[in-house]
């Protein structure tokens, strides 16, 4: 235990006057009531124990008579006893905000959710299928920001009015709502965001029978990424198999990026495109960073670390809606679409006119697949070896 502290369960045993260790207590409990003589170590090794459970039956002739039911049947019987509903609400905690204990931390409030890319809010996530059936919508307003419908969400007679995010890949018949928001006690006014989903919390049962209805009003979201798919831009995230990758030299897969300088395509390695004067690189330490995109889960821990290390300003919900967030790095999220890259490119090239053909083509390409794959693309800070924070970068 950390710093020789007692495990919580062992403290409970001591307070009850029991000197046995918690490990031995668990072994004894399993041995007497579950294992029926089987090996505890074997069950621990297997991660499970397959056996039978005894259930008492009410019988006036023989109160001690027991019947055996396989544990699998017992589990199925428990599931079958659950109430059926058109929709199920899943209560969850966000990667950043968690259960809300740190809701007074503006870094966490402004941290975009890795999947929805939305900050300063919790919301009801629904599938496109259910949103269409309920009349719920998301749409972009004139400045490009994301707005959406409100929904009245009712669980066990309690109703909350919650904004709605239509989430690609969400299972039909399920809706999600994050805990940790809606606090009013002990928080600054700016941090009192979202709705308090703990009103729906029932012990450890985080899946609830729910009723969802369209409500009046229009909610303004602070969403940092409004494009959901690659839209034919295959250079953003390059994917291939190892077999195909080995058919070419690695330099052919990693060409030098080009930028426009005086309307001329120029390599980014050219001194002419550097905003800073060249300096002597022959002395001192040299730092580099490589990210395994196969391992990145988009958790955003690096985003918070960078925000904290460099004391980056928090701009608030209104400015985030105006695309003025000041994170020095971000983790973009892209969904796969129903069309291939080639089909997306063909759509763009064959469309005629911006306000008619191309605009409609881009709108179609922006829709994620019903069951999409998700790719994360870290976009690092652009200080290009000139920032004083580089030597202590926590990322």
Map each language-model feature to its residues.
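A cross-kingdom feature strongest in bacterial/archaeal respiratory oxidoreductases
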Residues: 1, 31-328, 340
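Non-catalytic, well-ordered alpha-helical segments in soluble enzyme domains
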Residues: 6-33
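A broadly tuned preference for mixed-charge, low-complexity surface segments
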Residues: 7-11, 199-219, 341-361
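A short local structural element in Rossmann-fold oxidoreductases
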Residues: 13, 27, 135, 307, ...
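Ferredoxin-like iron-sulfur electron-transfer modules
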Residues: 274-298, 327-334, 361-395
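Non-heme iron-sulfur electron-transfer modules
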Residues: 309-369
